[in-house]
Amino acid sequence: MNIHEYQAKALLKGYGAPVAEGVAILKVEEAEAAAKSLPGPLYVVKSQIHAGGRGKGKFKELSPEAKGGVRLAKSIDEVVAHAKEMLGNTLVTAQTGEAGKQVNRLYIEDGADIARELYCSLLVDRSVGRVAFVVSTEGGMDIEAVAHDTPEKIQTIAIDPEAGVTAADVAAISKAFELEGAAAEDAKTLFPMLYKAFGEKDMALLEINPLIVMKDGHLRVLDAKMSFDGNALFRHDDVKVLRDETEEDAKEIEASKWDLAYVALDGNIGCMVNGAGLAMATMDIIKLYGKEPANFCDVGGGAGKEKVAAAFKIITADPKVEGILVNIFGGIMKCDVIAEGVIAAVKEVGLKVPLVVRLEGTNVELGKKILNESGLAITAADDLDDAAKKIVAAING
């Protein structure tokens, strides 16, 4: 689960991190009062969407010459003018795709005197089985480009979970950042604090880009991105309330209600599979035969008829879907249950696109019999390769 920048900063501020004063607004009418509550005279007006690249982004409704989703303002009137242009419009960034995202919230923040911009993130480094700091002196820009063009400028410092962030770890991170003076002193409290927040809140990612050294020598968190482990949200009611469903795909929201592992993609073949590995293999073979998957959908091993039907309805609700491939290997999951769920969903929502079903495993013959006797236009497949060929051929006509 992702949250907005202003929410992430409020959470970090609760741990004692140095962040600027700021106010989140939902209406243009709130912009003037928000700016007046800040020290000024420099302000930053930031679009709040769950995507990076906001500063370089462009608004669909504005001219190509218009400023992006993060703007400086040198007066309160300028803050209001920016708010009028940004709120309610669609921001397109490198991460949103062509559709972009509507800006429903702005964060008006006090400006900062920046001397240096750094990149700092915490994530789970699965290669060593530890939480690690990923740091670079090249902050405030596209870290993916830095990793591609100058990977030597990115360093990773893994943290021993038993010891936590030690003085030696802080020294290593500070050295990587080339910190000195007041910034090096700030580091002694900031980095252990970030590690503590990451662990206590069950984060999957904490990204600060940029972490700045101000002209007075001190550190400040200028931007913050947080992603939380969805499987751990049951013990974080304070985090769950921060969820903004308007930023999420409606199909993914519905899938979460049924405990389905569903991710919307850009292709045209809907997939319903049991098991993440088989789901990825199914998507791979669709690509092998020249098409793209419209989704990742793992119904899990113990799904009942209702859950299968819900998954099928979510897939068919995607207007991009031109065909559906159901690929089930029944172990815990029984093939007859899958068949009954698919038929129930088809009878409810109709079948307007080709449907290919491959069943194997527990109760496979019963599952095939149920499908054959349903009277529905369902194409059976013998194996995964056969299934992929048939759904691609059906779409190609």
Swiss-Prot record:
Sequence similarity: Belongs to the succinate/malate CoA ligase beta subunit family.
The EC number(s) this enzyme carries: 6.2.1.5
Designated gene of the protein: sucC
Cofactor requirement: Mg(2+)
Broadest EC class assigned to this enzyme: ligase
Assembly with partners or alone: Heterotetramer of two alpha and two beta subunits.
InterPro entries assigned to the protein according to its UniProt record, in alphabetical order: ATP-grasp, ATP-grasp_succ-CoA_synth-type, ATP_grasp_subdomain_1, Succ-CoA_synthase_bsu_CS, SUCC_ACL_C, Succ_CoA_ligase-like_bsu, Succinyl-CoA_synth-like
Keywords tagged on the record: ATP-binding, Ligase, Magnesium, Metal-binding, Nucleotide-binding, Tricarboxylic acid cycle
BP-aspect Gene Ontology terms: succinyl-CoA metabolic process; tricarboxylic acid cycle
One matching Pfam family: Ligase_CoA
Job of this protein: Succinyl-CoA synthetase functions in the citric acid cycle (TCA), coupling the hydrolysis of succinyl-CoA to the synthesis of either ATP or GTP and thus represents the only step of substrate-level phosphorylation in the TCA. The beta subunit provides nucleotide specificity of the enzyme and binds the substrate succinate, while the binding sites for coenzyme A and phosphate are found in the alpha subunit.
Domain ATP-grasp residue range list: 9-254
Recorded GO CC terms: cytosol; succinate-CoA ligase complex
Binding locations of ATP: K46, G53, R54, G55, E109, A112, E117
Name of this protein: Succinate--CoA ligase [ADP-forming] subunit beta
Tree of life domain: Bacteria
Keyword Nucleotidyltransferase annotated: no
UniProt-annotated binding residues for Mg(2+): N209, D223
Binding positions (substrate): N274, G331, I332, M333
Cofactor note: Binds 1 Mg(2+) ion per subunit.
GO terms for MF: ATP binding; magnesium ion binding; succinate-CoA ligase (ADP-forming) activity; succinate-CoA ligase (GDP-forming) activity
Metabolic or biological pathway: Carbohydrate metabolism; tricarboxylic acid cycle; succinate from succinyl-CoA (ligase route): step 1/1
HAMAP family xref list: Succ_CoA_beta
Catalysed reaction, written as an equation: succinate + ATP + CoA = succinyl-CoA + ADP + phosphate; GTP + succinate + CoA = succinyl-CoA + GDP + phosphate
